[in-house]
Amino acid sequence: MSLRSNKLLVAAVIFTVVTFGLLLTSSIFNNKTTTSLTYGGILPKFGQRIIEKKSNEEYIIEKIEHTQKDGEDVRSTRYLTHHSYLLRNLAKMEVKHHGKDFSINDICYKPHNAIFETTFAPENIDKLPNYLQRLILEAQRLSPCLIVTPLNCYHDSYRIHSEMSKWNTSNVTNFLNRKLRNSYIDAIGESEERPYIKSTYGPDLIKEWAHLMFKLPSKQTSSFSKKDLSSKIELWLSSIESKTNLTELGRPSEVDNYFDICTSMQQVHDFDERKRKFGLYDDDDEFLIGLDCVENKTKFIEWIQERELRGVSKPFNPNQQCDGIFKNSEGLEFFYGTRSFGNNTAPFDKMKTEIGLMTPEQILTTMLHSDFVNGFESIWTIERAQELLDDFRLAIRQEVKRFNENRSSLKIGIDTRVVQREESNETELEISSNLDSVVYFILFIRCVLLIFFAFFAWSVNPLRSAVMFLVRDALTSLLFSILCKSDGQIELNSELLGYIILLTIVNTYLTTRVSWYKDRNETCIQRAKDFPSRSNFSLLFSIDSLRENCDSRQLQYALAKLSKYLTALDTYSTETFMQLPNYWPFISILFVPITGCYWYFVDINLPKISVVLLPSFIVATIEQRQVEKSLLKERKAKKEFQKVQKKKMEKFLSDGAVDRLLSGNSESVEDKKLYKSKDCVIHKESAGRLYELSRSSYDVSKIMAYPNQRVRDFRFDALGCYFWLMKLKSAGILLYGSAVLFVLLSVAVMLIPIQRTSLQKDMNNEVYFGFSINNMSSDWANINKNLHAFNSEIDSIQSLQTISNWKKGFDRFEGRFYKNSSRISDANDYVEWMNQEPINWSVMAPLTRISPKFGIPSPFKFRFRYQIEVNNNESEVIDTVQRIDTLLTKYKGTLSSPIVDGVLYEYYHGNAAVWNSFVFNELLASGILSAFFALIVVIFSITPSISSVLIFSFFVIGSRLEIAAVISLFSLDNQQLYTDSAVLVGFLVAWAPFYELSLFRRRLLYKLKTRCTPELSSGKRIRPPFTKAVDTAQVFAIVLAASLIIAVVAGVVPEFQKFFWPTVILIVVQLVAFGNSIAVLVATNQMFEREVRNFLDNEFELGNGTTAGQVCHMAQKLIPPKYDIPIPMNDFHIRPTNMSKFYAPPPAKKRAKQTNNETDPEKKEDEPGTSNANNVSQEEAAHRLAILPWHFVLGGIPVDLTTRSDQIINGPFIGISSDAMRTHEINSELEDQDDYSSESSVEDVESDPAPEEEIKYHEENMLHMIEKVQKDAAEKEAKEKVHQVESAQRRAPNFDDPNVAGPSHRYQRNEERISTDIVPADPPREIPANPVPPPTHVLVQRAPRPHEMPPVIDRTIPRDPRTEPPNLQECIQQNDDPSLPPHPRRHQYPDHYGRAMISYCEDVYWTYNDGRLPPNVAMPPRPFDWHYRRVAPPEDFNYVPPPGQPSIPIPAEAMALREERARAHREQEQRDNSQSPSPSPEPGL
């Protein structure tokens, strides 16, 4: 098969090229900002990246908040002590990384290290002597971490820093002492003086060993002096000393602080508020009434000491400094005490703490320096540093989680949490802390889908389909891991969850599609023939044998065969119009710029989406290609086998084997082998030397092997609705016109201004102003002036509070050291400030390190840190964000475009920016995708028209626009995920039915090599194919049912409740996509009809006859009456001009007993002329009339003599119409078989008709009887009718029961029947004076039988191939093999039926009950087998009962009667044998 014919393979090639092109382009753009490339292995590591690394970051802040659930004031000893327990737990926490234990002291940010950084450049530290490097390294390790906590106002913070930096830990300090002593001994060499310092306090060891080391002689360098280093050590030691004005948390405060507490208490007049704020008791109100803080000072101090101060809060002044061991930080806003408290439900019910951590770059620098000093070969990389940082951040969260579960936390009602730095982590379904629930939910979704599709879609081979589903998942995971990792890692976030959802949708759809494709091709009914049949009549002739009133089982059989045939026709067809256009390679080049535009302007993650979908698509292509190749190979082998069998048969007929067989001689071994080798005829030999037919290709048990009746019923209902939609005219225009209106309305909704934001209290409210200024040194004065003006305007915003601003700290430094206000500042003053106050400089550290030698670098990068005060006033926050935006615009030129980031700011600013541009982005994306889908239609939908391209593209894009409108209306997050899912689902739902319609349209319009069908004239209607539409409806129903269950579970299970609304949105996506797909089908079908009518009117003059009208009758078989959706035949444009021909096997003809009025049996009935026509009419009348005894009718339901008077025959016969028969349900026994037993009370339906004179006589007599009984019958009409209907329904046979004879089907059979229900006898009537003899028989009239119907097309006239379709019999007879012997059952069929036609009628489906049928569905019998099922089997007189007593006692009289019958039977056999002639001795006769 050429590449042009395999459209799926072409699509896979294009998809692969586009995907790898996008990956290459994105990698090129990403590498422009990459400085170095390192090899990190093929497979990535999956982890939870807590934050995305922000470039230009001085240090990382981890925020921890304590919230009192009852709204109590947390500024008390009780809650502060509880907070100290958490910090101590964090200080003791260790993380194992690459086989080594690390503590938080190893990765925390330490401002005191700036004391040494301002003295030595990194390249100069390595030039120091080894003992001095060791001294600096150990001093840096003992430096306290940057922790902003209310405990810094108390001496308790030193205890926490001591535990964190291990100042007093004996084993650590002993090891520190040995390391310093060893480095000192190495420096002095072979000397007898080996000092030893006895101390267990780390700073004292640094002080003593530094005093000894500075006495050692060393080479003088120009970069440093021992005096400078000694001063730095002294500065470091003084910076970590305890402040003198700090008190212990559990001790009474100083006397001055008591006065402040008393004053604060008196300012609160409400005792309840005072009690809540200061933690007082009920009996304290009496003491505080009339208290004077000045006169009663001593009394108040004694009272508060008695209260032990633990239950009384210590108020924090607004500017109180909680700097702890950070000296020389006066006026530094970073350590303001009010920053440590906040409010959630009540004032001061929240306590805040900040812990500074090093960035990965700083960790890498520290670890490399440590390994260098220790003499180790360092293996640290930036990736390992990032891993260590992430491990610690996760460990902090785990520790906080355990701390919340402590008994003390539960007792005092404290809830502790770690504040996320990024907004994305708040909206990522909290993956970092709830990874287990996300994983479980994903597994739950996939398990539910697998179960549903295994039971309701993959019924033929669910194990194979499930395995291929998992194989696609595995290949996708592998390819995604290799191509889409970032820094050797794949982050588990909402973006990855979206990829999994898209993969699940596509993988499920493709698995189902390939499963059905494989099963239908394997059971194709036309596998042995050469495909394709070049006439579009092949779409219709396989259901020409359907009757209008056939049961649903026959309909299902025909539809299954048609579905298989259509699949095979699309698979193996080599017609030119089904191939891709010659210019498809040039058109496919347009995919590259289209996808590139979408990637660049709309979604930068398009390469990852393509990688997720590519493996499933390629595997599906490979599977389908393998199915095609295997079946083509099988067809080729079967043809070769048929040729060999034909030669064998010719040899078999010519070598005398048939003569030997017919002569009665036993078969030879070679003959038996020959019989068994003919697999197409003989399957296996039974015990009685009878041979069973093998399963032919007509067996539809596999294609119909749905798991239960409900699936089959759903497909029938879907097909009926499909036909109902396709026949709409004006209503169809209204339907897809409404869909167009909804799409346009969605665009209008997105333009409506909506208040989209709501105040987010839990968001990180910090704002960072980032600057990058060139030539800072040369333009210092002007830039400082602009910075001063910028700070003034920032300070004017009341809701912004300063946290760190190096410009303010530098101005304070200049004010203290340079009293002259007129002095002009320069860049050297900044370097001086850095040397004088290194800790303050480090806390407010710029992003770029200052070198004393080279001065301020260019560009000079720094950040200002502020905080937005959130006071439950959203309008104030929005106003602050707007003023910040205005300020940035104002200083865009003078300060080199400062950049602002922050969670709360970005939330409000981003919402405004995103929603303002949301409409533009969606319209741009819709325009690009419409071009993409139009290109798909142009290449793959077989020469489409412009209208079809616009229809398909518009409605598929409409799904995205409608979901975008919902997102805009409700301000939903994860917009890209929902819109991508909408456009993908919309394409999958609409493409397959649309493609099938396009293919059918192209077959009809193929002018040169395809004949035109007369049923498609301008006044008639196209019957579109339905297989893909029903398949799509089934897949959609399964996915929707599974989604509803998932939504219910997500709403009930607490761990999954966060996924409830996303699941609901995905359900809405499915409904919207399905609605638009219906609009696509209706609009496309009506467009195709107009196009085909115009073409046919212009090209041909069409005739009238047709056999395709029966296609229209399928609709009325598919919708049950309870739905009340009438689809009458008259509503369809295609109408049959004559009755269709039914090719079911006719019953064997048996001569009835001749009467005196019967014609001579030797008279030729085939003689043409009037007499022959009369014979035919009489024969048809005999088939449609049956004579029943009158007592049979009286035993059932009486004839309605009031409403059916025109159909009643006078005299002893009564005629019953087919409508009445349909109500009474007994006609199944009249139509089943013509050969009835002589003992039956019903005469043979093939008996001769009654003479016309006799019928006329009875009609006249019957009129008199009608006049007498009509009055009485009218009075009881209503009551009897109700009783008749109820009785018929109550006693109707259950054909779904396999023990009841008759076909199993869903709906009431549309056949004429008479009920045998017994009803109460009528009350006695008055006997008339001249009574009319009662009727003795009933004349029943029924519909003609299939073999009684006249031919649809008169074949006495040569067929016009342009206007007349081929006959089914002609299609089958042309494949008849004349070399084969006659069929064994030829006596049951007309004489003109060949072997092929009889084989077609002798379908294994009707013959053997060995097909795979669903439960509770009985195999219907062959039409000819009704006779054998109705009569009792012959009695076996040679039967020997088994030993033992029977379970049911048999009377002796019954056994005697049986013996008498057996004796009579044996005597009769002896008489028959004695009278039979002797066999002829001649062989072969």
Curated annotation (Swiss-Prot):
One of its GO terms (cellular component) is plasma membrane. InterPro entries: Ce-Tra-2. Residues 1401-1422 are annotated as: MX regulatory domain. One of its GO terms (biological process) is spermatogenesis. It is a multi-pass membrane protein. Residues 1131-1271 are annotated as: Interaction with fem-3. Residues 1-28 form the signal peptide. Somatic and germline tissues. GO terms for molecular function: transmembrane signaling receptor activity. Keywords: Developmental protein, Differentiation, Membrane, Receptor, Sexual differentiation, Signal, Spermatogenesis, Transmembrane, Transmembrane helix. Residues 1143-1175, 1228-1252, 1275-1306, 1348-1384, 1442-1485 are annotated as: Disordered. The MX region mediates a post-translational regulation, essential for the onset of hermaphrodite spermatogenesis. Interacts with tra-1 and fem-3. Plays a major role in controlling sexual cell fates. Promotes female development in XX animals where it sequesters one or more of the FEM proteins to the membrane thereby freeing the tra-1 protein (a putative transcription factor) to enter the nucleus and promote female development. In XO animals it acts as a receptor for her-1 which prevents it from binding to FEM proteins thereby repressing the activity of tra-1. Negatively regulates male development when bound to fem-3 and is required together with tra-1 for promoting spermatogenesis. This is Sex-determining transformer protein 2. The lineage of its organism: Eukaryota, Metazoa, Ecdysozoa, Nematoda, Chromadorea. The gene is tra-2.
